[in-house]
């Protein structure tokens, strides 16, 4: 499928959703029980997942899928937001911004699957948000 005709729309909408994620994560950091914020983050991740999947950006789709899973658990009351989770979510935001930057420059998301971040998200689900997981830290340059 030739997606070039949709690329500009994808980039514009991705930037809007990334800005929403950024704004809402800042609120979530201060108000971890804010259900409106939790719902906004879920919707932004869900929208990014769908758009990435449609465009064939599987790495971006996988990361946003796991973010969506975390927020589904939070929304259902199965886990609580804590500072460790917020830190990982900011790492997700950075990774998503990198994917979008790569797509803007090369029409390709790149080769980084962000496996350590995905593992951290899944560890939160497994520990029911109790923070009993190792956080991903970026390697030093």
Residue ranges and their predicted role:
Residues 141:
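Hydrophobic pocket-lining residues within nucleotide cofactor-binding pockets
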Residues 1-138:
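Non-catalytic helical tethers at domain boundaries
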């Amino acid at each position: 499928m030739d997606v070039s005709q949709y690329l500009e729309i994808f980039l514009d909408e991705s930037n809007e959703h990334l800005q929403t994620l950024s704004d809402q994560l800042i609120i979530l950091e201060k108000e971890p029980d804010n259900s409106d914020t939790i719902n906004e983050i879920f919707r932004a991740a869900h929208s990014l997942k769908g758009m990435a999947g449609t465009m064939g950006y599987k790495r971006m789709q996988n990361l946003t899928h796991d973010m969506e899973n975390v927020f589904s658990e939070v929304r259902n009351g199965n886990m609580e937001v804590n500072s460790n989770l917020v830190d990982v979510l900011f790492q997700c935001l950075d990774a998503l911004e990198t994917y979008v930057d790569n797509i803007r420059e090369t029409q390709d998301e790149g080769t980084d699957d962000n496996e350590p971040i995905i593992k951290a998200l899944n560890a939160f689900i497994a520990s029911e948000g109790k923070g009993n997981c190792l956080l991903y830290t970026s390697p030093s340059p």
